[in-house]
Amino acid sequence: MLQVVVSPDAQSGFSMGELSMSGVDVTTQAVIARSVEEVVAYSANPDNAPAWYENIKSVEWKTPPPLAVGSRVAFVAHFLGKRLAYVYEVVEFDPGKRLTMRTSEGPFPMETTYTWESVSGGKTRISLRNQGFPVGFSKLMAPFMSLAIRRANRKDLIRLTELLEQK
């Protein structure tokens, strides 16, 4: 039986960043009992996103795989009761360490960064950071969006942990 521990201590489970009132800035971490190579191979592959991201419904490569700086991937998600279509462009990719993507098309500018690091016992700490600076009416929703993203990211990392640890 898998038991997920939620704690502000990233060494033992999950932690979530602070709410930014000027925008969205949410960091969520998990420690997964799998090697960095396994966690990166699965979590950095956009084709796997619908399996572990609750809100992502579809993925379409706009450039040919594999993932590299300059790759563009379209996602369709359902978030806060709305259908969102957006395209991420990979702006940084250091395999096994860091992946940063920015929206090149979508409802508002967003940047997502994954980092991975090996921790004791052959485990991996994955950190997922979402930063965005909504404009116009969306700016008024930023505090609510931050809370919703925080909840969604926590669920997503729990699902990722379950999928990888059951392998």
What are these regions (language model features)?
Residues 31, 50, 60-107, 121, ...:
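Glycine-rich portal/gate segments that line the openings of hydrophobic small-molecule binding cavities
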Residues 32-34, 79-81, 132-136:
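Beta-strand elements of well-folded, non-transmembrane domains
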Residues 4-6, 12-64, 68, 165:
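Hydrophobic ligand-binding cavity/cleft-lining segments
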